[in-house]
């Protein structure tokens, strides 16, 4: 009897304590409200706000597969397949000086499973017309086809520049670091060893002026290589005529330098035919006076060099939106060397 009473008393005590235990139970916290990604349409399509900030970000890039063709282009082989992936991040935000822009471009290249590289293709900041960082110069611009050879050997520099823009017109000036540019020097006739006249190039000054006027677009670009004490100037323009666009360009170099070293002068022409909404065919031609051929080790002048001419054809086809195919073939015939035929076939998916 006593045992029964003890058990009943214990059960009653346990039942009485149950509300206290319930009050002490762990309660799950309310979930924080989620801030979904918001579209930013202030700077064009593709931008979104970085959550918690007023900075707009755009992510774009492409995947490219390409087969190059030419004599020994792949070492002992006359063809070589390569693949590239590129991603670009562009950040923009409003300031009292106008939009503040930052760009980072990463590029990944693969010749095969073991021969690969990852490079910083561009990284710069831009505000109120001023730009500083690693970016391509105006000398990287060219005609739309693949035949013209009117640019620098190296067009990607650590630079600082100012560019004024007003509607369809722009004009700018840049100071470029040229330490990976062109070196003037001499070649020993016995050993064939090249000896540079000076150390690494350290600075160059370039300008660019361009714009559009109706169906006509134009650009004038110049550059002075301080170490080599030579410069170059180039003019090019395009105009819509008939079913396509005519492009013309001319360049002059006072001596081999980091802005232009292929020849003392050259002229180029192309006609980009828009055959259909998806197909473009571009035949082109270029003539060089006192042709050297480019490279980073160059003579002190162009004296005694022969001329050269080049013809080519480029075909662009849009398979579907953001998916393109391109084929190009080029023939070069220099007076002082062997002629050559090169080309490539490319597939590219952009996003």
Can you say where each PLM-predicted feature lies in the sequence?
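N-terminal periplasmic/intermembrane-space "pro-region" immediately following the signal or transit peptide
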Residues: 1-60
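Outer-membrane beta-barrel "beta-signal"
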Residues: 4, 18-21, 239, 317-319, ...
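Transmembrane beta-barrel strands of outer-membrane/channel proteins
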Residues: 63-67, 104-108, 132-136, 173-177, ...
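Gram-negative outer-membrane beta-barrel proteins
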Residues: 67-73, 95, 110-114, 138-142, ...
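Hydrophobic, lipid-facing positions within transmembrane beta-strands of outer-membrane proteins
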Residues: 83-87, 121-123, 128, 156-160, ...
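Detector for outer-membrane/organellar transmembrane beta-barrel domains
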Residues: 200-310
């Amino acid at each position: 009897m006593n045992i029964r009473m003890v058990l009943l008393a214990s059960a009653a005590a346990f039942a009485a304590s149950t509300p206290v235990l319930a009050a002490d139970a762990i309660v799950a916290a309310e979930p924080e409200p989620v801030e979904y990604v918001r579209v930013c349409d202030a700077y064009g399509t593709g931008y979104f706000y970085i959550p918690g900030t007023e900075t707009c970000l755009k992510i774009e890039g492409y995947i490219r597969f390409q087969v190059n063709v030419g004599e020994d282009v792949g070492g002992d082989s006359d063809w070589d397949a390569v693949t590239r992936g590129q991603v670009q991040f562009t950040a923009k935000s409003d300031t009292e000086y106008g939009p503040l822009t930052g760009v980072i471009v990463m590029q990944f290249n693969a010749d095969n499973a073991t021969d690969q590289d990852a490079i910083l293709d561009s990284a710069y900041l831009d505000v109120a017309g001023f730009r500083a960082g690693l970016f391509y110069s105006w000398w990287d611009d060219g005609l739309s086809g693949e035949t013209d050879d009117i640019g620098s050997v190296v067009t990607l520099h650590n630079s600082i520049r100012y560019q004024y823009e007003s509607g369809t017109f722009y004009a700018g000036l840049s100071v470029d670091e040229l330490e990976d540019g062109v070196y003037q020097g001499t070649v020993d006739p016995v050993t064939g060893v090249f000896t540079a006249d000076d150390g690494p190039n350290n600075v160059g000054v370039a300008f660019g002026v361009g714009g559009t006027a109706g169906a006509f677009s134009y650009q004038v670009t110049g550059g002075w290589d301080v170490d080599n004490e030579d410069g170059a100037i180039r003019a090019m323009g395009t105009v819509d005529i008939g079913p396509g666009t005519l492009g013309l360009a001319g360049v002059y170099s006072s001596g081999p330098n980091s802005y232009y070293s292929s020849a003392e002068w050259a002229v180029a022409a192309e006609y980009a035919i828009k055959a259909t909404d998806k197909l473009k065919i571009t035949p082109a031609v270029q003539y060089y006076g006192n042709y050297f051929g480019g490279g980073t080790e160059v003579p002190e002048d162009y004296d005694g060099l022969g001329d050269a001419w080049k013809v080519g054809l480029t075909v662009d086809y849009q398979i579907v939106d953001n998916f393109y195919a391109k084929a190009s073939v080029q023939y070069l015939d220099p007076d002082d060397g062997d002629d050559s035929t090169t080309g490539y076939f490319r597939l590219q998916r952009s996003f």
